[in-house]
């Protein structure tokens, strides 16, 4: 199931982030606080099996004085290796796009990737 992340996902998101970005980049407490207070970020998760998450997507809502509307930027996409090849990243990105369209008058999405991205 693809859904918005909740504070109950903080521990799993910390583990996923450690797999994705390396250990020590954030803490469960910091993730929990961000999920509760950061109104400029949307986090989407994919449920895996056994209470684990299969992956996550982060969308930052950028605002510029030059434009009336928010510009969503997909800043993180991660799917655990054992769940890859099943279309989970595509499902999370579609969910993010549809969710943002319901809330904000969007004209486009921005996606940045690293030079070593092979997906």
Predicted regions and their residues:
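Conserved acetyl-CoA-binding loop-helix of GNAT-fold acetyltransferases
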Residues: 79, 85-98
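A short beta-loop-alpha structural element at the N-terminal edge
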Residues: 1-13
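Conserved active-site alpha-helix within GNAT-family acetyltransferase domains
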Residues: 90, 114-119
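Conserved beta-strand in the GNAT
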Residues: 52-61, 73, 78
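Conserved GNAT acetyl-CoA-binding A-motif
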Residues: 101-113
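Helix-loop element at the rim of GNAT/NAT acetyltransferase active sites that forms part
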Residues: 15-27, 65
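Active-site rim helix/loop that mediates acceptor-substrate recognition in acyltransferases
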Residues: 24-43
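A short, polar/charged loop-to-alpha-helix boundary motif
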Residues: 64-70
């Amino acid at each position: 199931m693809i859904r918005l992340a909740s504070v109950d996902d903080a521990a799993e998101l910390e583990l996923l982030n450690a797999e994705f970005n390396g250990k020590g980049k954030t803490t469960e407490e910091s993730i929990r606080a961000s999920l509760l207070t950061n109104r400029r970020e949307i986090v989407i998760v994919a449920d895996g099996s056994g209470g684990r998450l299969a992956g996550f997507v982060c969308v930052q809502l950028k605002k510029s004085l030059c434009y009336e509307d928010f510009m969503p930027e997909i800043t993180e996409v991660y799917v655990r290796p054992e769940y890859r090849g099943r279309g989970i990243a595509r499902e999370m990105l579609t969910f993010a796009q549809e969710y943002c369209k319901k809330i904000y008058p969007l004209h486009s999405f921005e996606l940045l990737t690293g030079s070593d991205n092979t997906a």
